[in-house]
């Protein structure tokens, strides 16, 4: 296999940043045994793929840093670093450790030995094993003592072993004297090394550094010393370089003074002098379990703009297998007595606790790998790092940029939408945006579940305030716009008062009033409809408010018969003309030999469910205004068998009937529909009537320039039949049997242009879909009613059976019973 070989000169000057400043585990402590007796109840979130609690296993909780950065929230979105290559430049790796026993976890170009093919000692494998386990230790849920997993547990590690020197102890700290050495070879080779490593890695973890702070040197010194390396870091914009800030705060220098490490180390802080590096380089400081900056950790200081805080104190991590048995007496001196005693008593121990910015940096590296998978091909590395900074916790103490820089790492916020989510219906995220909150589709009963079923699990992208895409089901924006007050409407109809007056000059006046409680709780009379007719021989001219225009097809006596039998204003009328109920209609009727000709012109709005709270004749205009006309031809309305045919035209502004398409789903084109009805009434025997209607509509293609591009071939159908027997038990009682189907889409297609993410340049990508719309069920409503009318009282009983309610297939039959009685005093 091809290997990348790091030829680092002056290796003794590069020190690991774990264990208090070096690769030795002097700040490592044994892990005390813990029991997890918690039993949490899952609280599924429908906006994510899997409830986050699913990921909060004992393995997850054994590494407190995971919960501290809210890693499970990112996992719930389906991101775990899969497909992401993480470069790890570190001392050495125990690749046989339990945390790395996973197929393909190691990139084939990994280099696990030193120059000359020397095998690192178990102690030399300590630091790299620890950092790698935090980044990408495998998730296996096996009952291994102290088992844990990494932040990006599905990422692949490209490990490069380098030899690191030991960090200075108290009294030995001294910033490296850069002018005292020749750096040309180092600069040349490290530049090539990182250039090649960057070509194969999405993010590179560097838990090491020189002694000294970035502010100990001038820009000119660093520019002259590392020109090629700096240029490489700047040119590799698609790779993020993560650096440990250093562990030198509070250490004693050679002058006996305590070091105030107010700024990160040289490599971690290069972005201060070279701003172009701040876009893809990040320095990481360490915090403890309380979220406080670690005493030993360098601060962000001058690197605040590209510095972040992450867990780095007593972090659970993996160590080489059987470490104690491999240690020489000299190597044992690197451990404090507590750790050494623990390892001696647990010689096979494979986990310890470690402190250092070496272990905070891998939390950031792993988080970037998770975000890289989540936003792969959508956001560039620079954009991901910017997102990590913007979403970091900046509240309270984390607002102190001198210490915490951009704040505390928060993977939940980084993987979740920032601010209000938006839709882009054009080709760029820099074009006009539409809020997703106000983008929705409200469908009437005729659609049933047809659109939702066709959409299935189809997803689209919404974008947050930072331009990041999030995939959500299209169906989540589809809602029902079905009246919930049918029963209450019948009760109101039962209580309504009708008035009529016929003058000798041919004028007829009719009105209906309903009594409601208004918004203040007071009872008010609200006009339901009003009608003025002028009748002259075979000619009728009518003007009405609040009525379905197709009701002109009925004689006054027939209207009364239907009203008293069902208390349903929509019975046997054209269902689409309810769209102009809150409006006016003008009708003309004339006899043509043996036939009658009717013409109606109408305009109005669909009456809202709270219409009775508005003042009389108050129109709450919406964008869905409808207007049109219809022509009817029928035989004598008073004959024993009446049949008629109606043909009409209906135009609805900015929408489709009473369906509402808002925001990114907006339809701005008017809907033009042709509707037809066959209506009939037959007097079978005395006081026994058979009445019914069959209705059909066909709508023109509707086009839009947003997500819904076209709705075509829309056909709807409905029917309503009833048998009514008058004076069965009493003179003024009515027994009826009725079967009906409300309008249902029989055929339609919808064409969509769905946003499916973006590229790093902000170009929104779309997917075109054309789907049929067919409800899964067909609602059939069978009902029987009995009503009785006296001078001082009236009663009404209605029993209904509804199969496939709302045109949605179901095994259940809904049964409703209405009983109403009113007495007049």
Each language-model region and where it sits:
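C-terminal subdomain of the subtilisin-like protease fold in secreted/lumenal serine endopeptidases
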Residues: 63, 70, 201-205, 373-489
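Extracellular S/T/G-rich loop segment that most often corresponds to the catalytic His/Ser-adjacent loop
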Residues: 90, 270-369
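Subtilisin-like serine protease catalytic core
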Residues: 40-53, 62, 72-108, 115-183, ...
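C-terminal motif of bacterial Sec signal peptides marking the signal peptidase cleavage site
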Residues: 13-16
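Outer-membrane beta-barrel channels and translocator barrels
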Residues: 536-539, 592-595, 636-640, 683-687, ...
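Substrate-binding/access-modulating region of protease and related hydrolase catalytic domains
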Residues: 22-26, 80-81, 138, 142, ...
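Outer membrane beta-barrel transmembrane domains
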Residues: 554-556, 561-578, 598, 614-623, ...
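Residues on the lipid-exposed face of transmembrane beta-strands in outer-membrane beta-barrel proteins
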Residues: 530-534, 586-590, 631-635, 676-682, ...
């Amino acid at each position: 296999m091809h290997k990348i070989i790091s030829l680092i000169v002056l290796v003794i000057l590069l020190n690991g940043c774990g264990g208090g400043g070096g690769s030795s585990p002097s700040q490592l402590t044994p892990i005390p045994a813990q029991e997890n007796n918690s039993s949490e109840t899952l609280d599924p979130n429908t906006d994510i793929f899997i409830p986050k609690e699913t990921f909060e296993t004992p393995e997850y909780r054994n590494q407190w840093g995971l919960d501290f950065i809210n890693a499970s929230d990112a996992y719930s979105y389906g991101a775990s670093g899969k497909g992401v290559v993480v470069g790890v430049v570190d001392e050495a790796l125990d690749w046989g450790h339990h945390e790395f026993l996973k197929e393909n976890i190691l990139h084939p170009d990994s280099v696990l030995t030193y120059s000359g093919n020397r095998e690192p000692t178990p102690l030399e494998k300590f630091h790299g094993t620890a950092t790698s386990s935090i980044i990408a230790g495998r998730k296996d849920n096996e009952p291994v003592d102290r088992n844990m997993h990494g932040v990006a547990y599905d990422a692949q590690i490209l490990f490069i072993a380098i030899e690191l020197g030991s960090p200075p102890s108290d009294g030995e700290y001294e910033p490296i004297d850069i002018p005292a050495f020749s750096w040309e070879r180092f600069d040349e080779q490290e530049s090539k090394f990182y250039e090649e490593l960057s070509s194969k890695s999405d993010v590179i973890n560097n838990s090491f550094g020189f002694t000294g702070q970035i502010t100990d040197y001038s820009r000119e010194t660093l520019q002259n010393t590392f020109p090629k390396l700096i240029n490489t870091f700047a040119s590799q914009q698609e790779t993020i370089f993560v650096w440990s800030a250093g562990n030198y705060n509070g250490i004693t220098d050679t002058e006996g003074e305590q070091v105030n490490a107010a700024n990160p180390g040289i490599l971690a802080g290069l972005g201060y002098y070279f701003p172009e590096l701040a876009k893809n380089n990040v320095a990481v400081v360490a915090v403890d379990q309380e979220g406080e900056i670690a005493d030993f950790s360098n601060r962000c200081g001058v690197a605040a703009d590209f510095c972040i805080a992450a867990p780095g104190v007593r972090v659970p991590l993996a160590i080489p297998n059987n470490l104690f048995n491999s240690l020489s007496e000299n190597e044992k001196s690197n451990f404090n007595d507590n750790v050494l005693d623990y390892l001696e008593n647990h010689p096979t121990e494979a986990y310890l606790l470690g402190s250092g910015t070496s272990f905070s940096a891998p939390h950031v590296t792993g988080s970037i790998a998770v975000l890289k998978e989540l936003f792969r091909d959508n956001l560039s590395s620079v954009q991901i790092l910017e997102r990590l900074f913007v979403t970091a916790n900046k509240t309270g103490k984390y607002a102190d940029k001198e210490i915490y820089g951009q704040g505390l790492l928060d993977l939940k916020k980084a993987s979740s939408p920032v601010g209000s989510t938006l839709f882009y219906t054009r080709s760029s995220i820099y074009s006009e945006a539409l809020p997703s909150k106000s983008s929705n589709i409200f469908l009437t009963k005729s659609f049933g579940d047809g659109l939702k079923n066709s959409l299935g699990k189809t997803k689209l992208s919404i974008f947050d305030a930072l331009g990041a895409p999030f995939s959500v089901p299209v169906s989540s924006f589809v809602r029902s716009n079905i009246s919930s007050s049918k029963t209450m409407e019948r009760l109101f109809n039962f209580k309504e008062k009708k008035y009529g007056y016929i003058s000798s000059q041919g004028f007829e006046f009719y009105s209906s009033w309903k009594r409601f409680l208004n918004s203040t709780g007071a009872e008010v009379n609200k006009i339901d409809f009003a009608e003025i007719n002028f009748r002259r021989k075979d000619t009728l001219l009518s003007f009405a408010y609040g009525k379905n225009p197709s009701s002109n097809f009925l004689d006054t006596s027939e209207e009364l018969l239907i009203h008293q039998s069902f208390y349903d204003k929509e019975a046997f009328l054209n269902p689409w003309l309810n769209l102009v109920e809150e409006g006016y209609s003008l009708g003309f009727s004339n006899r043509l030999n043996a036939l009658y000709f009717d013409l109606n012109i109408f305009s109005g709005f669909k009456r809202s469910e709270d219409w009775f709270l508005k003042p009389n004749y108050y129109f709450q205009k919406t964008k869905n205004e409808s207007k049109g006309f219809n022509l009817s031809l029928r035989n004598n309305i008073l004959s024993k068998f009446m049949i008629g045919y109606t043909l009409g035209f209906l135009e609805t502004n900015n929408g489709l009937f009473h369906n509402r398409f808002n925001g990114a789903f907006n339809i701005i084109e008017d809907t033009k529909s042709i509707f037809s009805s066959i209506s009939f009434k037959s007097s079978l025997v005395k006081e026994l009537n058979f009445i019914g209607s069959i209705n059909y509509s066909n709508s023109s293609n509707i086009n839009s320039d947003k997500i819904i591009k076209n709705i075509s071939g829309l056909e709807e159908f409905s029917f309503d039949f009833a048998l009514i027997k008058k004076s069965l038990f009493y003179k003024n009682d009515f027994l009826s049997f009725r079967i009906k189907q409300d309008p249902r889409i029989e055929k339609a297609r919808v064409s969509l242009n769905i946003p499916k993410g973006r590229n790093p340049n902000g170009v929104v990508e779309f997917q075109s879909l054309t789907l049929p719309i067919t409800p899964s069920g067909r609602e059939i409503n069978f009902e029987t009613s009995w009503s009785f009318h006296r001078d001082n009282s009236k009663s009404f009983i209605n029993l209904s059976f509804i199969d496939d309610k709302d045109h949605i297939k179901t095994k259940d039959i809904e049964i409703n019973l209405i009983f109403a009685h009113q007495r007049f005093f």
